[in-house]
Amino acid sequence: IDAEIVIELTPTNLKDGEPGLSHITSAMKYSKNVITVNKGPLSVAFPSLIELANYNGIMFKFSGTVGGGTPILEFAKRCLKGDRIVSFKGILNGTTNFILSKMEEGLTFQEALKDAQVKGYAETIPSLDIDGFDAAAKLVIMANWLMGMKVALEDVNRIGITQVKTQEVSKALEKGNAIKLIASCENKKLVVKPMEVSKLDPICVNGTLNSVTFSLEYAGNQTIIGRGAGGIETASAVLRDMIEIRENIINEKNWF
């Protein structure tokens, strides 16, 4: 294929990463730069994909896999590179955050899930979201890329939100807290589970918003908040990666 960039956008498969994994590896072997928003290949084979990209001297961009249009990975990798990330935690799945926000309004889990499905936030079979798989996949990508770990989905201690009761949500509210599905990386331990979070905590956002707080060795805590999903938002992430690859190609040509 006479192209400088291959964009891989097939549906996410968290079991074995296919067919996206084969698409990406084939493109890399033919020395094509690759962009993807597919979490599957990255959650099962991140270290080997980075190694293959480096071996073939190509650019591999995946900023849309975490946060969609909100540049969570880019923020951490670029803006925080003068410091050291000690740990991070946040809300990485907009669907579950929408459901838990609705439960704060008094809806049961099933009622909130139905509302999310009607609005198009949740799939007819919503297991990837409500059982924490989506958040875990994003956590794996962040841990590998930002913390230098070599982990896969099975390394995450994962609990979804299906057992969260409206009464628990109400009790948390009485204390000025909210129950959120929090993904965290601390002391090389990866956890996704419902947790009580203070309403005053910057990561305590509602609706379909995502949020991540990075704890730094010198600069304290830095938080990024934004919309985590959606067609236009994800498309903007692909465009962002395309622009960066284009700029790098132009710079290389000018250098020589």
Predicted feature residues:
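Rossmann-fold NAD(P)-binding glycine/threonine-rich loop
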Residues: 12-30, 37-77
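N-terminal Rossmann-like NAD(P) cofactor-binding module of classical short-chain dehydrogenase/reductase
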Residues: 5-7, 11
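Conserved active-site and cofactor/substrate-binding residues in soluble primary-metabolism enzymes
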Residues: 1, 19-22, 44, 67, ...
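Rossmann-like NAD(P)H-binding beta-loop-alpha module
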Residues: 54-123, 129-134, 141
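Hydrophobic, small-residue-rich alpha-helical packing segments that form membrane-like cores
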Residues: 1-5, 26-29, 118
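Substrate-binding/catalytic subdomain of NAD(P)-dependent oxidoreductase enzymes
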Residues: 102, 113-211
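Catalytic, metal-anchored helix/loop core of enzyme active sites in primary metabolism
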Residues: 87-89, 97-100, 115, 121-124, ...
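Predominant activation on well-ordered alpha-helical scaffold segments within soluble catalytic domains
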Residues: 25, 50, 73-77, 96-101, ...
